């Protein structure tokens, strides 16, 4: 869509105005006439008509300055400055920015980038002057990026292009938007031009005369002719320009300008007349013969018609350029042109190189080499261009015209400070002349360069180089430019003294502008004119006379006539205001097609057929097979161009109604090209960055554990739960404990079973059992609270016990955000299975001296020596010491005392010495009471996370018994801390924090289940443990994780959303459907849905940290509120110093990635699938806010519409294909569509791409289900890797070849056929043979048909996944064994480099000779491995290079440290596969009733739109009949049959001529010519239009007869080239009609016309 599709802002151009400096006032340097014109422009719309160099731009700057109050920010209005070329845009932006202090931004582009509404809105808010090409503004207005109401001042440079009878963007802006009734406020309009007219001007009767005896080198000074001029066109141009711009043309008296601007003297130099020499004629004949030879070779080598036509056109253009240079410049000029093409443009003219007789040259190079040889033979032997003198420059070496140019340059070249521009029409001529002039010694004083547009196709010309050349010309480094029209306007060239028109200007404006380049005083404007060429003389005369006439007409108009305005049909979208018209409909349609999915074998593009009807020309538009629909017919129009525009407008309207165009009339989401912002990163990167962003969220506290209504100072009834511990193996004793809570736990919580993982693989299975309620008196409650506080201090904060006194009962307040529960030791009653709290044990612990006030501690009781022990802090009874906690200050360690070793004391032997000696040597302690028995003690352990997925510390897979480790301690080195706190009690308490953490999480999951259950009953089908698994991330490092559920849920979500989009949006292509699905399933959207349902509070994303275990008796000390939240939880902390990032506060804050919050949605879907099936998952999706429902009629419409493909039934063996697939289709059209490649467009139906989208989605789910169920123990990442291997294009392509379904692919691309054949041959080789060959690129189409086939089965079965499951297992059986596993080599290479710390370099691919050359570099310490590969597909080339690099690294001995997938699958536990969760009721679909009809009717919808009418019912019926009567076609699967030549004689059989000029359409009598009928027949069958050629003219001039032949190219199984000749006729139309009659008769006999049809012509 041209410039509008890409408004690339050039901030550099407007850099000076980006900041406000000192005020700039452009009035200080303005001339009087500029100020006068500016004053008038402030008051009304005007068009300033001044010559080049008269300061028009400065008047515009003055106007911007005067109206600055309207655009100064914060005003929402702007000034828009339009310039028709990119150099002008850049130049004018710099001028405005340097002359004013406005914020300026300029826009231009080539369609590679695009800007959205938000970016335009931002720029309108930031900048005050926007300088752009008119196409950008036009498209921005059409798509409502910019509205006319927001423009305060509209400036149009070179505004003469705005003519109502033209479709220039200037004219369209004014016609469609300035004159629109919807515009409330119109901007001020200011136009600038050096010539207010367009075209060639008037043709005066005066002609140039050349005085006799004058040398060709002497100029003819021209004098203005008088009279005889036709002024009407000038008047119309000026009147029309004023009317369209709503402005008045204003100018300045010539006398005032003469003192300011110099006007060059004009001189005319004659050459010729042109009479080509014999040598030139011979060269032309030889070049023609060379062209024919190249054509024959090209046709013989290429079997693809489209490819050969493209190459032929390139060859013809090349030949025509060489011939033109030969005639205009001579043989040496043509030789230079050929050499230039050969060195620069070979690839441009013929991108895909094809070998010729073993040579590596392309057809273009073959022709150029031959042309160079021919032209070189005619050059004087041993001579060089630089050695020639002026006298020797004669024809045919140089043409006479070129010799005159050299004479002119020789004459003026010796003048001081001379600078010259030579204007030519063609780029080829510019380059050839420049090359020759640079090498002529006689012109060595000229330093020459050529200047052409950067869009000219020249590889060595860019905008930067253009600017550099102009800069060098201005500085004098270059003093001669050979330029095309790009030098006439848009480039600031001010110091030119001589302008030479080698070729005449084509318009008056071109004449004036090129002349205006000679701005210096005493400048010359030289025109080369051919002698005796009357048309050229009249043309030049008209240009010269036109300027005077324009001035007269501006002063006093002689007529009010104007050109008729070209009316446009417009379609407008009501809710956005976006609009399209017939002016832009063609470009918009091409833009839509350009955004359709494509591959290297197919380029989507519309095809146009024209039908010459009675009421006018009708255009039939055929869209690509992957478009939303296939055909649109326009209304009868007077010209092909208007008919084409009308058909395109109808197509665009229908595309919008089908959703393929958005409400802003742009290609819908999912277009092939990513819409990349020119100022920001891509939207994909933004979404990715957002998903990785961390946010602070609270974690939910289980409501059942909150202390609601509990008072510690009163009687309370608590629910009693017995905590069960089952050690495996039974190598430890555990004190029985009870859990006491205020509210009863949910029933599902009572089923809690947790494996607590100890060292060496040992496990304790823990659970709870409800035993009823128990009453707590006030004293008992306080006692229990103190006991729990004591236990937690010993486990987590035991450093407090190093002091002689510890106070309990400080933290007895109950916070609303905290939990309340009690963990107390229990014992079995003496009778029955009843349990009770072991209050004596509690009281005994709390009676320890450390908890008493020092002043309250009585003197130790006296014990007998046999019953007591002397400890560090006194004498204690042995019964108090055993089963207590002691502290040894000499090593700062706490111990459990498990017993007293009566037989061992300090004198006993220990490690070759006594214990006394050991303590003296090790700790320098002299024991005072060595006779005391030693204590058997066990060090108190640090509390650990027992939910951790700990790896066994030995190679044994099961836990083994582990003997406890005890030490012997002298009692006198220990101080007694807690009496009665035994080792068994400590062991139990070490398990309880992990158990309670899991219980809290389970209670949170139950709460979420209750929330969902209140909204949909299907939530009852999922267990709380399943929900908990779906809420727990891998970061928790537990034995449960959401990742497996997430993998399954992600695949299911893509399937059901893709299915919904497929059925709902029938008009969207594969790419748009993918984008629509992505909009729903992407992390950003899932995050929003999750936040809306507050799922983030349920997520568990941190591993249990025992040090941050808070419970009654150990409350959280970090009080968090809104005032300190940000300070407490800082995010911008270095990863190495993030102590506070996971700080636990009173509000349970934690940091969560957005992606994690999104992943939980998918994991919950997976959980519902596994436990509740599809129906439960659908209910959850509806609750979360994802719509996946659709109406059955929508499916029926899709099934019914598939019958359009039944016309292809003869292309393949349907029964055989169904047998290969293992499924019998009810709707055969679906099966046929699944095998139609988009390159095949010779039918009315579509291609497989939409079915491929659907099949890809369902295949991903069923493969995921297969892997999930078959391998229950493999990691989620490994499931993803295996799935990628299974559904990768290579694997699917292998499956297609193994099952031979690829032979049924319907295609029309010889390149694709060749690629498939190469791949098929490779697949069928043995492994040893494959090792010797490079694997060919896998054609994507092979994998696509497997996916589209799966999609077709899904639709035909009414979404019955059981059928899809069976077909998948059969088709992919060789793949699912994973026998020949091929991982992605690029991924494997990246992982290998990361594993070993190698630096991986991937330079950008370089394209040359039609192939991508890819390099892979790996830096191994001081050595670099470099591997390269080349392929037409860049991904394939990178794959090959990566494979070679991997091979080299493995040869060096570098391997991945982790197990490969092959090794994992060998040992993985395997179960029988199953289709997970499928309990959906399939839709009842009836058999296709039209299956017996080989030729279904095609119904074209009528398209209503503004200012147009819909008809063509007649054409649609005709199309139906043509399809119905078509003979058998065959795509040949790429086999190119040479066309048969069938020639029909000029005379027709009598039965053919007896038929009359009428054709019956279902009872309607419609008159139609045979020629028109033939055009319609070709269009209906998607053939090329018939070609009529004049064969012979005979007879005298007044009785001349014409004989025509018509050529019809019939595509199909028997490709036929039909030629029919007419009899001699007095009129050409009659001869064409007679030939068409013969063609129709032959087509009827061949079966391409219904036998029952009566065709009389």
UniProtKB/Swiss-Prot annotation:
ATP binds at residues 50-57. Residues 1-14 have a biased composition (Low complexity). Residues 1384-1451, 1569-1645 form the DRBM domain. It comes from the Eukaryota. Residues 1010-1173, 1214-1358 form the RNase III domain. Its cofactor is Mg(2+); Mn(2+). Residues 856-978 form the PAZ domain. Residues 1533-1547 have a biased composition (Polar residues). This is Endoribonuclease Dicer homolog 4. It comes from Oryza sativa subsp. japonica.
């Amino acid at each position: 869509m041209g410039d509008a599709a890409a408004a690339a802002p050039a901030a550099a151009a407007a850099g000076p105005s980006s900041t406000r400096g000192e005020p700039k006032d452009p009035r200080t340097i303005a001339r009087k006439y500029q100020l006068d014109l500016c004053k008038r422009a402030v008051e009304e719309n005007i068009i300033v008509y001044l010559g080049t160099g008269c300061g028009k731009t400065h008047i515009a700057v003055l106007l911007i300055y005067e109206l600055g109050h309207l655009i100064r920010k914060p005003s929402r209005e702007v000034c828009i400055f339009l310039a028709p070329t990119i150099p002008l845009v850049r130049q004018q932006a710099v001028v405005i920015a340097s002359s004013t202090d406005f914020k300026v931004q300029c826009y231009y582009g080539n369609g590679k980038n695009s800007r959205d509404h938000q970016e335009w809105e931002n720029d309108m808010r930031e900048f005050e002057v926007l300088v752009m090409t008119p196409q950008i503004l036009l498209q921005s207005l059409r798509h409502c990026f910019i509205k006319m109401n927001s423009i305060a001042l509209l400036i149009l440079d070179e505004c003469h292009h705005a003519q109502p009878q033209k479709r220039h963007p200037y004219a369209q802006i004014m016609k469609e938007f300035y004159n629109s009734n919807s515009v409330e406020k119109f901007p001020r309009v200011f136009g600038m031009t050096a010539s207010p007219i367009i075209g060639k001007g008037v043709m005066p009767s005066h002609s140039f005369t050349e005085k006799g005896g004058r040398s060709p080198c002497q100029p003819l000074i021209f004098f203005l002719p008088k009279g005889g001029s036709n002024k009407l066109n000038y008047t119309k141009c000026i009147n029309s320009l004023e009317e369209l711009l709503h402005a008045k043309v204003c100018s300045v008296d010539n006398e005032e300008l003469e003192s300011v601007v110099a006007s060059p003297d004009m001189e005319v130099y004659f050459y010729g007349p042109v009479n080509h020499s014999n040598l030139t004629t011979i060269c032309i004949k030889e070049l023609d013969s060379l062209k024919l030879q190249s054509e024959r070779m090209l046709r013989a080598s290429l079997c693809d018609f489209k490819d050969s036509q493209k190459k032929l056109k390139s060859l013809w253009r090349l030949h025509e350029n060489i011939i033109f240079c030969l005639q205009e410049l001579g043989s040496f000029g043509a030789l230079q042109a050929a050499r230039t093409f050969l060195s620069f443009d070979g690839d441009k003219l013929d991108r895909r190189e094809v070998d010729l007789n073993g040579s590596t040259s392309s057809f273009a190079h073959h022709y150029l080499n031959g042309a160079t040889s021919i032209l070189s033979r005619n050059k004087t032997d041993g001579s060089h261009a630089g050695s020639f003198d002026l006298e020797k420059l004669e024809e045919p070496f140089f043409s006479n015209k070129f010799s005159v140019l050299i004479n002119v340059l020789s004459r003026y070249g010796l003048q001081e400070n001379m600078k010259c521009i030579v204007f030519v029409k063609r780029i080829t001529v510019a380059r050839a002349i420049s090359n020759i002039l640079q090498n002529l010694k006689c012109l060595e004083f000229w330093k020459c360069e050529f200047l052409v547009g950067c869009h000219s196709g020249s590889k060595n010309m860019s905008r930067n180089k253009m600017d550099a050349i102009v800069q060098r010309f201005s500085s004098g480094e270059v003093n001669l430019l050979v330029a095309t029209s790009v030098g006439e306007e848009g480039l600031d060239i001010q110091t030119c003294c001589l302008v030479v028109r080698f070729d005449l200007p084509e318009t008056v404006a071109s004449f004036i502008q090129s002349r205006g380049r000679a701005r210096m005083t005493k400048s010359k404007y030289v025109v080369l004119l051919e002698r005796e060429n009357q048309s050229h003389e009249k043309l030049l005369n008209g240009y010269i006379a036109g300027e005077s006439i324009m001035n007269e007409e501006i002063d006093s108009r002689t007529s009010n006539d104007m050109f008729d305005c070209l009316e446009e049909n417009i379609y407008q979208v009501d809710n956005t205001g976006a609009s399209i018209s017939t002016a832009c409909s063609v470009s918009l349609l091409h833009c839509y097609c350009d955004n359709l999915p494509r591959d290297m074998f197919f380029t989507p593009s519309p095809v146009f057929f024209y039908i010459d009807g009675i009421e006018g020309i009708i255009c039939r538009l055929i869209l690509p097979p992957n478009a939303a629909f296939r055909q649109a017919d326009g209304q009868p129009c007077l010209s092909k161009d208007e008919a084409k525009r009308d058909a395109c407008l109808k197509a665009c309207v229908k595309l919008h109604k089908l959703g393929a165009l958005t409400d802003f009339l742009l290609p819908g989401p999912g277009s092939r090209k990513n819409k990349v912002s020119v100022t920001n990163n891509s939207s994909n990167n933004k979404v990715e960055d957002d998903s990785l962003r961390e946010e602070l969220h609270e974690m939910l506290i289980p409501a059942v554990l909150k202390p609601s209504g509990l008072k510690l100072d009163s009687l309370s009834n608590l629910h009693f739960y017995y905590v069960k511990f089952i050690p495996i193996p039974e190598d430890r004793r555990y004190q029985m404990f009870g859990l006491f809570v205020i509210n009863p736990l949910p029933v599902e919580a009572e089923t809690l079973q947790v494996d607590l993982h100890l060292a060496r693989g040992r496990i304790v299975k823990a659970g709870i059992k409800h035993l009823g309620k128990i009453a707590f008196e006030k004293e008992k409650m306080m006692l229990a609270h103190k006991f729990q506080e004591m236990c937690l201090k010993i486990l987590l904060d035991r450093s407090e016990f190093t002091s002689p006194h510890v106070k309990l009962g400080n933290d007895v307040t109950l916070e609303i955000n905290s939990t309340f529960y009690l963990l107390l030791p229990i014992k079995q009653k003496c009778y029955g299975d009843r349990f009770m709290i072991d209050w004596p044990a509690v009281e005994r612990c709390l009676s320890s001296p450390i908890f008493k006030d020092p002043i309250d501690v009585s003197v130790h009781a006296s014990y007998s020596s046999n019953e007591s022990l002397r400890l560090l802090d006194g004498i204690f009874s042995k019964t108090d010491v055993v089963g207590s906690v002691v502290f040894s200050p000499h090593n700062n360690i706490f111990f459990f005392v498990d017993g007293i070793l009566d037989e061992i004391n300090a004198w006993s032997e220990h490690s070759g010495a006594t214990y006394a000696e050991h303590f003296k040597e090790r700790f320098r302690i002299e024991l005072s009471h060595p006779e005391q028995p030693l204590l058997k003690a066990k060090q108190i352990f640090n509390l650990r996370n027992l939910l951790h997925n700990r790896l066994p510390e030995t190679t044994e897979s099961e836990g083994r018994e582990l003997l406890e480790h005890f030490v012997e301690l002298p009692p006198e080195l220990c101080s007694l801390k807690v009496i009665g706190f035994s080792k068994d009690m400590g062991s139990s308490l070490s398990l309880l924090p992990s158990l309670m953490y899991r219980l809290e999480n389970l209670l949170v999951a139950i709460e979420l289940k209750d929330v969902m259950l209140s909204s949909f009953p299907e939530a009852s089908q999922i267990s709380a443990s399943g929900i908990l698994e779906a809420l727990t991330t891998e970061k928790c490092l537990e034995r449960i994780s959401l990742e497996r559920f997430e993998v399954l849920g992600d695949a299911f979500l893509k399937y059901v959303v893709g299915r919904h989009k497929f059925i709902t949006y029938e008009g969207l292509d594969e790419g748009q459907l993918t984008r629509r699905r992505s909009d729903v399933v992407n992390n950003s959207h899932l995050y929003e849905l999750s936040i809306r349902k507050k799922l983030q509070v349920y997520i568990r994303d941190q591993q249990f940290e025992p040090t941050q275990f808070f419970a009654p008796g150990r409350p959280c000390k970090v009080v968090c509120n809104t005032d300190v939240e940000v300070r407490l939880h800082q995010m911008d902390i270095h990863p190495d110093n993030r102590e506070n990032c996971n700080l636990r506060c009173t509000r349970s804050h934690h940091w969560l990635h957005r992606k994690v919050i999104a992943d939980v949605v998918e994991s919950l879907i997976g959980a519902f699938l596994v436990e509740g099936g599809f129906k439960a998952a659908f209910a959850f999706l509806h609750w979360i806010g994802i719509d996946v429902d659709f109406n059955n009629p929508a499916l029926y419409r899709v099934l019914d519409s598939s019958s359009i493909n039944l016309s292809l039934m003869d292309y393949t063996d349907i029964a055989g294909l169904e047998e290969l697939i293992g499924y019998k289709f009810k709707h055969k059209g679906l099966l046929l569509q699944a095998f139609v490649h988009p390159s095949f467009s010779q039918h009315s139906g579509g291609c497989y791409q939409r079915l491929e989208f659907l099949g890809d989605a369902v295949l991903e789910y069923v493969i995921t289900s297969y892997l999930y169920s078959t391998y229950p123990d493999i990691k989620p990442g490994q499931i993803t890797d295996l799935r990628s291997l299974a559904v990768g294009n290579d694997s699917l392509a292998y499956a297609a070849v193994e099952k031979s379904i690829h032979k049924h692919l319907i295609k029309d691309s010889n390149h694709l056929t060749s690629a498939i054949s190469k791949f098929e041959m490779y697949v069928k080789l043995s492994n040893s043979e494959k090792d010797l060959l490079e694997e060919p690129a896998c054609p994507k189409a092979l994998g696509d048909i497997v996916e589209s086939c799966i999609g077709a089965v899904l639709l035909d079965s009414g979404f019955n996944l059981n059928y899809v499951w069976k077909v998948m297992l059969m088709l992919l059986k060789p793949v699912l064994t994973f026998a020949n596993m091929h991982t992605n080599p690029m991924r494997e290479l990246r992982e290998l480099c990361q594993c070993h710390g190698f630096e991986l370099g991937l330079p950008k691919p370089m394209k040359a000779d039609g192939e991508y050359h890819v390099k892979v570099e790996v830096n191994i310490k001081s050595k670099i491995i470099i591997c390269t590969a080349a392929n037409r597909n860049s991904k394939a080339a990178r794959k090959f290079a990566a494979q070679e690099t991997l091979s080299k690294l493995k040869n060096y001995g570098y391997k991945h440290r982790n197990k490969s997938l092959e090794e994992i699958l060998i040992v993985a536990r395997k179960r029988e596969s199953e289709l997970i969760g499928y309990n959906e009721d399939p839709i009842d679909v009836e058999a296709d009733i039209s299956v017996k009809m080989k030729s279904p009717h095609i119904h074209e919808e009528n398209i209503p739109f503004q200012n147009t009418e819909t008809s063509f019912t007649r054409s649609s019926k005709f199309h139906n009949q043509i399809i119905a009567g078509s003979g058998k076609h065959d795509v040949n699967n790429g086999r190119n049959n040479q066309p048969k030549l069938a020639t029909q004689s000029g005379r027709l059989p009598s039965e053919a001529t007896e038929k009359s000029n009428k054709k019956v359409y279902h009872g309607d009598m419609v008159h139609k010519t045979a020629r028109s009928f033939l055009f319609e027949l070709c269009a209906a069958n998607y053939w090329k239009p018939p070609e009529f050629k004049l064969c012979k003219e005979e007879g005298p001039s007044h009785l001349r007869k014409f004989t025509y032949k018509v050529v019809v190219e019939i595509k199909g199984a028997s490709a036929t080239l039909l030629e029919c000749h007419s009899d001699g006729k007095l009129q050409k139309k009659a001869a064409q009609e007679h030939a068409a009659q013969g063609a129709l008769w032959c087509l009827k006999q061949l079966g391409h016309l219904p036998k029952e049809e009566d065709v009389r012509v």
